[in-house]
Amino acid sequence: MSITKEFDTITAISTPLGEGAIGIVRLSGTDALAIAQSVFKGKNLEQVASHTINYGHIINPKTGTIIDEVMVSVMLAPKTFTRENVVEINTHGGIAVTNEILQLLIRQGARMAEPGEFTKRAFLNGRVDLTQAEAVMDIIRAKTDKAMTIAVKQLDGSLSQLINDTRQEILNTLAQVEVNIDYPEYDDVEEMTTALLREKTQEFQSLLESLLRTAKRGKILREGLSTAIIGRPNVGKSSLLNNLLREDKAIVTDIAGTTRDVIEEYVNIKGVPLKLVDTAGIRETDDLVEQIGVERSKKALQEADLVLLVLNASEKLTDQDRALLNLSQDSNRIILLNKTDLEQKIELEQLPDDYIPISVLTNQNINLIEDRINQLFFDNAGLVEQDATYLSNARHISLIEKAVQSLEAVNDGLALGMPVDLLQVDLTRTWEILGEITGDAAPDELITQLFSQFCLGK
């Protein structure tokens, strides 16, 4: 997609393909009303009031054949998502009918929209900035209510406001430095001394570092915790997965080696999305298929944010158990002693003190797993403070880290006694980096790449 503004009219199906109660085909652009009217039998859409819903039929203009009975929403620029004329045709849900209407609109002069092009136009037309555009996709992808809360707040402009206010303060500081350099005799502007610049720079740095401290929590809530369930065969890993999911997704049998691959599922644990990875039991095996599963399990363990190590409390520790304890000791790990409903034989004195005795069969202490996760990753604090602004996007986090580094360079220069005017470069770089977050200074290639990740029709 070109970054220059385009004024042709685009169209796409905005609802998931498949059967459903309603399907929506969207148009945006100067000719949206005229194109929609050319296939609509009902009120004249070019004459109806903005933000109205109009009953009628979509027809094939060449044959007069009725395609579907519809409700058509008409929204006139600039009070629309794209700030262009927007028409949304609400059809009966179904692949055939929505595709037929889409093809009619294209034949009448609309262009098939590219992924994310409606939101891209909202960005190019000043309706949203880049952080708000990204928040749209975060809302769509949110797996828990906490993740959605963060995304909605970002869409509302909380992060944008904070970044823009900081950029303005940096710009004011740069302007003050420039005035001091170009007009040293101008007494109405406070002199930007080394001490004053250090104070301002530290203030900027403190604010950005405070924002960075929200990144761990925000990123977890946005992307989820990659959680590997490990243990030797037949200790209850798949049963634990099913218990957490509240449904049977993994194959549970008494035969060692029945989980031959890595099974991934998402589950909501008190607002935290866990990407649960049920791994094949890690053991030595001659079975080629199972060997592949074991290797994938080891890889999943290395990449996991959280490890749930399941041991069988009704049996003594084996060499495989001890190997897994060693293998996972440097991970964020929760040790689970399963099958406590049976006679206990495991040697507790050989285990770390922080294990949790559970019974997947009777549901004993499963809730303690959730509490331990909160303790490990959130220091027992609440997951989301209602009025707080969170960093959750990896791109934003990386740019804030770079901005902090630029401010550190300013402070280092001040400590070395460098003149204030020579430190403008790093301060200007900080201002530019923060502009990349909101899109004010983002490269065209980045903007194109970001919007290409959106779904069609959004």
UniProtKB/Swiss-Prot annotation:
GTP binds at residues 234-239, 253-259, 278-281. Residues 224-378 form the TrmE-type G domain. Its cofactor is K(+). (6S)-5-formyl-5,6,7,8-tetrahydrofolate binds at R26, E88, R127, K458. CDD domains: trmE, TrmE_N. It holds the Pfam family TrmE_N. Mg(2+) binds at S238, T259. It comes from the Bacteria. The keyword Nucleotide-binding applies. Binds 1 potassium ion per subunit. The keyword Metal-binding applies. Homodimer. Heterotetramer of two MnmE and two MnmG subunits. Belongs to the TRAFAC class TrmE-Era-EngA-EngB-Septin-like GTPase superfamily. TrmE GTPase family. Exhibits a very high intrinsic GTPase hydrolysis rate. Involved in the addition of a carboxymethylaminomethyl (cmnm) group at the wobble position (U34) of certain tRNAs, forming tRNA-cmnm(5)s(2)U34. This is tRNA modification GTPase MnmE. It comes from Streptococcus pyogenes serotype M1.
